[in-house]
Amino acid sequence: MDTTALRSAYEKLFTAAAGTDLGEAGDGGWNADQILAHVLSVDAAIAAVALGVVSGSRPSFDNRISLDAWNLDRIVADHSGRADLIGHVRSQATILCDIADHLSGHASSVLIPAILLSNDALVLDQPIPLAGLIDGLAEDHVPVHTQQLLDLRAAVREHS
């Protein structure tokens, strides 16, 4: 697989996350650390799915654990601060991209039973090719969370 777009999307996320002017979500949504923890959780799960396919098993993907507040807080607490968390997300993103770079055409076309929720709504409940799961990170998931981080900057400016 070609991960150029995904790597580029991550770089934009890391630039946004490194800002020192990130406030709280005005709508009670996730703060910057929770957004990063969510991305880390999703990336680790998709990397595990990809490695499972390579090993010959047929894993599934369910993003509900990456939406769980307790799990996100656990991930945040495991880090010494935002820089440490960003470093871990960066490392996990690199691992995921490196795995994807080495997937064969056959492996990337394996259908993965998937359940995806977003904002408490079911987005997907059907098999999706592994490549589609990974490409969805670049096309939607990472840019959406990058925008969330940028919106946290705007929230600070509005309250200044």
Residue spans for each PLM region:
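Short, helix-capping/interhelical loops that line the mouth of catalytic, cofactor-
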Residues: M1-T4, A45-I95, V156-S160
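Helix-loop segments that flank and shape redox-cofactor active sites
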Residues: E11-Q34, S55-F61, H102-Q126
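Alpha-helical scaffold segments that form or flank carboxylate-/histidine-based iron centers
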Residues: M1-L6, L22-V42, L72-H88, I115-H141
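Glutamate identity and glutamate-enriched acidic tracts
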Residues: E11, E24, D68, D98-D101, ...
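Structural signal for well-ordered, non-membrane alpha-helices
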Residues: Y10-A18, D43-L51, R90-S104, T146, ...
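A hydrophobic membrane-anchoring alpha-helix module
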Residues: D135-S160
